[in-house]
Regions:
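Conserved loop-alpha-helix segment in the C-terminal half of the alpha/beta-hydrolase fold
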Residues: 218-260
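Alpha/beta-hydrolase fold catalytic core
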Residues: 1-29, 50-53, 90-91, 194, ...
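Conserved alpha/beta-hydrolase catalytic His-Asp/Glu region
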Residues: 131-137, 154-217
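Conserved HGGG/HGGXW glycine-rich cap/lid loop of the alpha/beta-hydrolase fold
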Residues: 15-70
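Catalytic histidine-centered segment of alpha/beta-hydrolase-like enzymes
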Residues: 256-268, 272
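Flexible "cap/lid" loop of the alpha/beta hydrolase fold
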Residues: 106-111, 116-160
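Conserved acidic catalytic loop of the alpha/beta-hydrolase fold
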Residues: 75-93
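Gly/Ala-rich beta-loop-alpha elbow adjacent to hydrolase catalytic centers
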Residues: 97, 101, 105
Length: 280
């Protein structure tokens, strides 16, 4: 696979961000997850670029983008996305966000509305990942919370400590199916480690303490929600997202199909087919 061409731009607060751009046609922007990178979409960029103008962004302090100790919050990442669309003068854009990338899309919609957008694709992200001990079982299921507040604090502290890489490996190893090869597992870890561990901890804290349940029912764009049956992000919470967005589509990858958090890496053939069928 040939290396995709890269571009760069400077955000409104002076940070240089790198992106991959390939193809022509209607634009689709791919937004990676927490502490990941644009290169993880390598199995999507080439096939999609046969039909679309594909842009895969390395968010601030991720991948090949500038590493800075500020702006490590979802609201700033969504403004970075806004800056990217303005810089490239993109309109009628489809946004695809994996994991935290979905939160960036939700925050964009909350702050800027559907400006410049045509469709969204939300891939494997719960509405609120930190549990409230006062929730009912139904609220817990709908939110898709997978961590307690103490677990968030402990993980953030670990990412700032001497065992940061070990903790990273443990977290990432729990996000692929048993069929995933050691090469795939290591590649995901290496993408993750491109972000300085203390920065990753700061961003994780913000990610885990932001609740999108009030934003989701107000979405009035066409939406595709993709989940994994065996994912660390509970699929039922994403079914809840589907029910809240009128006219949305919902697809679940079963475990033998690579139905964990990184299904777009484990089963790119099915993933790409679903995306292209949805985009048209």
């Amino acid at each position: 696979m040939t290396k995709s061409p890269r571009g760069a731009f400077v955000t409104s607060d002076g940070v240089q961000l790198s992106y991959i751009r390939q193809g022509s046609g209607r634009p689709i922007v791919l937004i990676h997850g927490w502490s990941q990178c644009a290169e993880e979409f390598k199995h999507q960029i080439e096939p999609l670029s046969a039909r679309y103008d594909v842009i895969a962004l390395d968010q601030r302090s991720h991948g090949e983008s500038q590493k800075v100790p500020y702006g490590l919050k979802i609201s700033r990442l969504s403004k970075d996305l806004y800056d990217l669309l303005a810089e490239l003068d993109l309109n009628e854009v489809a946004l695809l966000g994996h994991s935290m990338g979905s939160c960036v899309i939700l925050c964009y919609l909350d702050l800027f509305g559907p400006e410049r957008l045509s469709k969204i694709i939300l891939v494997d992200q719960s509405p609120f990942v930190t549990s409230d001990p006062h929730w009912t079982p139904q609220e817990l299921e709908e939110a898709g919370a997978v961590l307690t507040a103490q677990q968030v604090f402990d993980t953030v502290a670990a990412l700032r400590g001497k065992e940061a890489e070990q903790v990273t490996r443990q977290v990432m190893d729990g996000m692929v199916t048993r069929q995933a090869t050691s090469e795939v597992r290591e590649w995901i870890v290496q993408c993750n480690l491109k972000m300085p561990r203390p920065f990753a901890g700061t961003l994780l804290y913000n990610l885990c303490h932001t609740d999108w349940r009030d934003v989701i029912p107000r979405i009035n764009l066409p939406a595709l929600i993709i989940s994994g049956r065996a994912s660390t992000m509970p699929w039922k919470s994403q079914e809840w997202i589907h029910r809240q967005i009128k006219g949305s589509q919902f697809e679940v990858f079963e475990e033998p199909e690579g139905g964990q958090h990184f299904m777009f890496i484990e089963n790119p053939e099915k993933f790409n087919r679903l995306v292209m069928e949805y985009l048209g």
